[in-house]
Amino acid sequence: FRNHTTEIYQSIQHDNNILSMDIPADTEIDFEMPEGEMNHHCFETIEDICQITTPNSILEIGFRRGNSALMWLINSSATLMSLDIDDFSVKSVQLLESQFPNRFQYLQCDSRTFKSKKIFDLIFIDGDHSFEGVEGDIKMSLQLNPKYLVLDDYFHGDHHQDMYKIISQFDLEIIKEYRTHQGQVLIKNKLRK
């Protein structure tokens, strides 16, 4: 699977509107990331999360250039729906749609107004990092009743205390914390069996 992915992405060039990672022919994952974006340590985190959760369907809140979307698609066989309020990532969306035609879908929308009847096993939250934004994304996510949530930037100095308060507020169970990049946290939805 990674060999196929390597062939697809080895020629991608970095610019502001397309995936900013290169996967060389030797299948080693190599990332060229602007400061503040997900890097190769995050790839290992997402790989671990996929091994723990074995998701069939993932919702991603916050797409940006599509780096994390690609990581979810490489590390799982799940379908992935990505949401973002902005439209600056058109080339990345087109590339992922063409290479993962039955697994990837992108919706440009505000997560606060997102509604779906689809069931998601895992929801990855990396959108609005304000207290109200994270709280709203978790509240919306819990209405979709996923098995797991993942919060990005969990250990970021500006967000950690807020995220911890929100996790406590919704009585969510922390499964694992990842101290890579700005950190991620894997959370179990205790209400879904």
Predicted feature descriptions by range:
Residues F1-F124, D128-K193:
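A short alpha-helical cap/connector motif
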